[in-house]
Amino acid sequence: MFIVNNDIPKHNNAANMSTVSSIIDAIEIVINAKMRRTGICGATETLLCHEKVINSILPDIIEKLIDQGCEIRADRNIKLLNKNINDASEKDWQTEYLDKIISIKSVNDVSDAIKHIEQYGSNHTDAIITENYKTAEIFLNEVNSAIVLHNASTQYADGGEFGMGAEMGIATGKLHARGPVGLEQLTTYKYQLRGNGQVRP
């Protein structure tokens, strides 16, 4: 799952904060998160879009996704943006497509996004794009996923990227011990990554 908040990340340029580069970064993050490798567990399957940016940044994201052969399934608010968007069903919000398909839903705020993620998410990887530090911290701390990212692609959800070597599997449960259980076996991790527009090559 992924949320584009109404506060798009801004990065310094020589003169001032550049909103244009921020929008480009946000678009590139979303495209990379979905399309870099669609068949991996870190691929974004649902995009939750803040209602305030539906008409500004989302049309560009939708156009780029469609240009790359991605099928879009969306709620009524999003569907109005492009005639090539299909209706999303209740099942779409919880589907791991592992393909060039994405579901898009509008949300009122970060709390609305978190509620959606709690109801439909896999507890694997979730990300937020925002320059608002407070909003990002709420998301990072309240979303109950193994990996949560701020301003970076969900494609970073990989053991190799965490310096763990070859990835043998993914666990999203909080308790994964088997056999004798000591203090170390009761330990679980939540990884929080803070980015600045990073996409995975």
Predicted features along the sequence, with ranges:
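ALDH superfamily catalytic-core signature
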Residues: 1-99, 150
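Conserved C-terminal structural/oligomerization subdomain of aldehyde/semialdehyde dehydrogenase
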Residues: 89-201
